[in-house]
Amino acid sequence: MSVGLKVSAFLHPTLALSSRDVSLSSSSSSLYLDRKILRPGSGRRWCKSRRTEPILAVVESSRVPELDSSSEPVQVFDGSTRLYISYTCPFAQRAWIARNYKGLQNKIELVPIDLKNRPAWYKEKVYSANKVPALEHNNRVLGESLDLIKYIDTNFEGPSLTPDGLEKQVVADELLSYTDSFSKAVRSTLNGTDTNAADVAFDYIEQALSKFNEGPFFLGQFSLVDVAYAPFIERFRLILSDVMNVDITSGRPNLALWIQEMNKIEAYTETRQDPQELVERYKRRVQAEARL
């Protein structure tokens, strides 16, 4: 069996790996590429590509260990506001980015959960769905990442992530509704079921990034849409590059600029994983599944 072509479990929130698999070094890690790169579905269209910029991950040196089955229960509904995440889950990363961008680090406590060895009390006392992200606020617990980033933006102070104007609101809704289809398309290429699907999906992203010229982001200015896509584009970029020698930015200048500008936003970069560790964890999972 071919190894390196399955990604669905890697991106599912309930199957995310624990913090033991994530580098917690405060130093940044860089990954430079100098290779022939083939865009998915492009047949014989090869191009020689050399990256001059590093793929960076800024990892918070102050990250606390994830809570596991041996951890004492959190005192739920004691008046605190808590965001339950996993450091390796892209869905949880969305809510984490929103919390950081709003400047709520001192108002929303981050509670990392080890999803491979999760505490029983998390399901029993915190969130019956037993997934992350989950937000404890005003004596109730809310879930679902897209709902949470909207909730955080609406119910807490800080810079707005919601677009102004009806046109941008309509486009935002369309792009947010496409997130699942985007992920499924890229996964189908990685799984080998549709070699052209990722190419089509990233072309859609490239076109979407050209709609508004006020800035490099989906709606011109940084918004909920960027928060929703960033964790997945981050992972797909690294995995496609390493596993399939694919440069998703080749022929896509808007996407290349978007990635460059996203890497200037601290609220995002401080949630990122070490890129080499991310890819290695993916490969280990695929190898394990290939042996089943």
From Swiss-Prot:
Major enzyme class:
transferase
Gene3D superfamilies hit by this protein: 1.20.1050.10, Glutaredoxin
Entry's EC annotation: 2.5.1.18
Domain of life the protein comes from: Eukaryota
- Record has Ribonucleoprotein as a keyword: no
The role this protein plays is: Catalyzes the glutathione-dependent reduction of S-glutathionylquercetin to quercetin. In vitro, possesses glutathione-dependent thiol transferase activity toward 2-hydroxyethyl disulfide (HED).
What is the protein's given name? Glutathione S-transferase L2, chloroplastic
Question: Could you tell me the gene encoding this protein?
Answer: GSTL2
